Structures are given as C-alpha cells and as structure tokens.
C-alpha cells in the first residue's frame, strides 16, 4: 500500500472584498471580521464616566479597517478617511456596534460623538497592525 500524500482540506473563510473594494461594506457580511484584530493604541475615551470605548479593528485578509464600540447607548462611533468618506454607527446598550469598512491603505482614524455633539478622534494612521 502506498501512503497518501494528499493533505486534508482546510476550510478558510473567503473574504468578500479587499482593500478599497471594502469601502462602505460590512465587516460581518463580508467575512472580514473573522480575522480582525484591534490595532494597538487606537482606543478613544472621550470625557469621563460611562462613555463608550471605540477602537480601530483591522482585517489582514481584507486589508480593511473599521471602528468598533462596546456597550453604550446613544453615542455614535465613526471611521473616517483623511479627505474622504466617514462611516458612522450608533452604539447599543449591550453588545458591540461597528461601522462600515475603509481600505487600510489610506490615512484613517476613529472617533466618537459625545452627548454635547462634539467629535473626539484618535490619531490619523495608515495601514494595519
């Protein structure tokens, strides 16, 4: 008997978009959220008290980023392209909220709209992790 040289198939999630083609699309619907990582140093904390945390998430397989916020009600989170589009999402009392994506190859930042109607932003950055 000859040993088999065929390896078992490994299931991988196929990304629904890549780079700029992800702009305006959902990280969940495209499968881009499956390999997402939080980019270090991108957490924004406006004010004090029970304010939402918002951070930048990056998908290597999709080369895209988006804003994600946790467990807060009545706030809006944003991912913004430098000189381009912004994508917003309302936060929710339980669970996480996320914006649509933008390609990671352009300068981008995350922000949160506070109760006084002011935006607080993280630093501009380009690329993934």
What annotation goes with each model-predicted range?
Residues 1-12:
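Secretory targeting and sorting signals
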Residues 12-129:
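Post-signal peptide N-terminal regions of Sec-secreted extracellular proteins
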């Amino acid at each position: 008997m000859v040993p088999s040289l065929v390896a078992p198939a490994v299931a991988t999630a196929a990304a629904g978009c890549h780079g700029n083609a992800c702009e305006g699309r959902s990280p969940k619907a495209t499968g881009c959220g499956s390999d997402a990582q939080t980019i270090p140093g991108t957490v924004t904390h406006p004010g004090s008290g029970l304010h939402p945390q918002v951070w930048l998430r990056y998908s290597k397989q999709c080369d895209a980023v988006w804003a994600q916020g946790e467990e807060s009600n009545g706030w809006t989170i944003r991912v913004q392209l430098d000189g381009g589009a912004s994508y917003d999402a309302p936060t929710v009392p339980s669970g996480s909220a996320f914006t649509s994506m933008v390609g990671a190859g352009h300068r981008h930042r995350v922000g949160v709209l506070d109760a006084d109607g002011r935006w607080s932003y993280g630093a501009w950055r380009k690329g993934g992790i």
